[in-house]
């Protein structure tokens, strides 16, 4: 038994029929049948354009607990295409309005001059000229117009969503397929500029590709999404870091000046204290000075008493012990004036003295002997 759902106006929707079955049949199988293929069970999916039912009709169909069978017609396909085109047209108009509201911004592409051998960079530009890649390169900047993003996409989350929308834009603006003859002619064309190997070139800091001219590098930085990879996110991140570093360097001297000014103001406030505020501060200072003087006097008295005790006579034993403990100090010798030597009589032995005395006594004895001889001669 089939029933047709009719709108409130009394008109039947063209090309749409809803089949309703008994609740027993609904328990066995519940699914939505599409003409192009089968869907999973109990899975909701978007339905093309005018094939959507009004809210009231869907509510009635749900209460019936039946199986819904959708059948599309050429009119429904054309209406779905019209709906997708209208959605794209509304999105394109909203995008153009956003572009009018936000003026285009510029971003700097980072690159360096290099010398290449078969497309491979072997030396790059430094402050002293072209040197091997082990040295620090001289990085240059070139401005290009920034690619506009959708609202709601953050800077850090770059953006599978942004890339997807841009790829869709490229597909919409791509020219229509040409004849096979034109395709054959395209195969005979020369390779692009960025594939040509030269002795000199410009190397992109983000992707390290070498380009023959600055125009080719800027075109790559702006429309690199067509090749499947965009260097713009890298350039924006590097410039953002550079800005934050410059801001920190600018803030450091300002903070130093503020600290100096604050310290000078504090010193001024301390010097500009009112006299009635100075008096209570002076009183405790005077008390402290008096206390210090008293303490010094007490210390002096104690020292004097200690010295007096040391000067009192000690017993002999203690004095001897102190003398023993004290090391012997050498006394300086006194120099006496030299006196001339005088001959002194050497001591003679007793025997020699006796002999001399005997000799002195001998002459009178000889005289006595000679006298009798003389008398005899007479």
Swiss-Prot record:
Biological process according to GO: positive regulation of acrosome reaction; regulation of fertilization
Pfam family, one: Spt46
Cellular location(s): Cytoplasmic vesicle, Secretory vesicle, Acrosome; Cytoplasmic vesicle, Secretory vesicle, Acrosome outer membrane
Annotated stretches, region: Disordered: 1-56, 244-265, 277-378
Keywords from the UniProt entry: Coiled coil, Cytoplasmic vesicle, Membrane
Entry keyword annotation includes Membrane: yes
Record field: compositional bias (Low complexity): 277-339, 349-378
Gene Ontology CC entries for this record: acrosomal vesicle; outer acrosomal membrane
Main location as per UniProt: cytoplasm
Tissue specificity as recorded in UniProt: Exclusively expressed in adult testis (at protein level). Expression first started at postnatal week 3 in round spermatids, elongated spermatids and mature sperm.
Subunit structure: Interacts with GOPC.
Chain's role: Plays a role in fertilization through the acrosome reaction.
UniProt similarity note: Belongs to the FAM170 family.
Protein name in the entry: Protein FAM170B
Taxonomic placement: Eukaryota, Metazoa, Chordata, Craniata, Vertebrata
Gene this chain is encoded by: Fam170b
